[in-house]
Amino acid sequence: SAYTEGLFYLNGFLYESTGLEQHSTIRKVRIDTGAVVQKIDLPPEYFGEGIVNWGRRLISLTWKSHVGFVYDLASLKKQREFHYEGEGWALTQDGKQLIMSDGTPELRFLNPETLQETNRIQVTLDGKQVRNVNELEWVKGEIYANVWETNWIVRIDPKDGHVTGVINLGGLLGSADQGLGPDSVLNGIAYDAKGDRLFVTGKNWPKLFEIRLKKRGEPGH
């Protein structure tokens, strides 16, 4: 039931960041039970956003404060801060660099050591900009991204920003979405590369889903 802003899978655990001022956290969660095994609170003035792992570090963004944090991955102790222009929405990595969304149609590429920007691409679908690109995940050479306030995950070519496919997750929650507010949108993608498992969730959602993708028209599984 967390206000999920960032999500990734690592070594059998989910790492999740949650938002809202005075309530933002980063936590390590058992994937089988949902039990929180480790947690830190962000300072109350910060609205937590996306997170990603890089080596022995965990890197996190904040929404409008222009500041991010670097933590020791094992202990979740803060090591340092870094700064960026604009808003911070989400992070992922491709094994060589970090990839950041900021709510615009652009994705930024960051040097994982200096955390300085090295490149940007425009996300487009059929020649039109895709706005509100939110939570990110690197999946089999593509960037998967939630589009805020939609049921979409778009698949983005990291070379040119072109959307190569759209995953429609409308109706995924079913009856479990009753009583959730308008802010409780799809947001959160995590990929277990070794097990080829794809997980999704949303803000305040009571469930995490493992999904398998099929092309439109294929029979269900």
Pin down the residues of each PLM region.
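Signature of short aromatic-glycine-proline-rich micro-motifs recurring in repeat-based ectodomains
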Residues: 4, 133, 180-191
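Beta-strand-rich domains and repeat architectures in extracellular enzymes and scaffolds
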Residues: 1-25, 40-52, 89, 202-206
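Short loop/turn segments that connect beta-strands within beta-propeller blades
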Residues: 30-34, 72-76, 112-115, 157-161, ...
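Residue-level detector of Asp-centered blade-edge/turn motifs that repeat once per structural unit
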Residues: 9-11, 53-55, 93-95, 138-140, ...
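Hydrophobic, well-structured mid-protein blocks that either form specific transmembrane helices
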Residues: 68-126
